[in-house]
Structure formats: structure tokens, C-alpha cells
Amino acid sequence: VPGSFNHSAALEAAFAIRRLIVLTYIRAALKYSYKTCPVSTGCTSSKGYGVKYHAEGYTYARAVLGFVAALNRTAAQIVEDQLSPSRAPNEFSLEAHCRVRAALQSVYPILGIDCDMVGEGYMIQHDVCGSSCSSPPAPPIPAGVQDGYDPFATAGMFCGPGEESI
């Protein structure tokens, strides 16, 4: 229906989607920065350094570091430095993981997320870094579409020439 576009609802949905994407990659970056950490340095779930975990941690972090850097360059640089592919296996430790964790936690408020949303992960002890996560509560992420919403009521599945724009 022409003229039925709700700009504020679209912005709210875009913000919610962005927050969900950020949550996914921050959780994965934290998980693999921890799994990269060898048992000998205080980590309990990892058997030792693994190039696979290193690559996964770096890749997941890189997925959101551009966005994080736009908001807090220092935090992004800390994560980049700690998970960089140029780091030697013997440079990974619980301390490196805790630096990643602290840097990411410091930007939760400006990312619109909080500690409860990120969680602790299935293998990361709550106080593994000597302190628990604390951040102000973020607004809840909307649960989904409103009752009665029909995505096909206003848009066809396929567009004809000139029908691509909203």
C-alpha cells in the first residue's frame, strides 16, 4: 500500500537486527579467544593452542571490529592485537583472552547490548578473568513481528521493472 511505510519502525527493526548480528559475533569472538588459550596458562576448556581456534576467533572478531572501531577505536585495536594472525602460539594466554573480553565488554553500552545478552558461553567460567561482567542494562531486543503482520499484503514476491524501490 503506497504511503504505508513506517520510518521509525524500519529504524527500530534495523537497530534490532544490527544488535543481533553484533551479539552473534561477539559471543563467537569471546568463545574462540578463550578456546585459543592453553590450559597451561589458566584456561580450563582448551587442550592447548590450536590454529583452528585462533583463526575462528580472529575471523569472528573481524566480522564486527569495523563497527566497533567506528564507535571505539581503542577497544577494536586491543581485540585486533590480541587475536592477530601474526601472534605466535606461545603468546596466547588467559591474560590475552581477558584483554579481549574487557575490551569488548567496554563497548557493550554503545553497541546496545549488555552482559546478560552476551552471556558467559558454555565453557567460559563466570569469573575466569577475576571479575564478572558488568554493564548497564540495554533495552530489550524486540521479539519479532507484530500480530497480524502479513509480509505479502503490501509486496509481491517478485518485482516488475520499475517496482524495485519502496
Give, region by region, the residue ranges found by the protein language model.
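Mature extracytoplasmic or organellar-lumen-exposed domains after removal of signal/transit peptides
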Residues: V1-I166
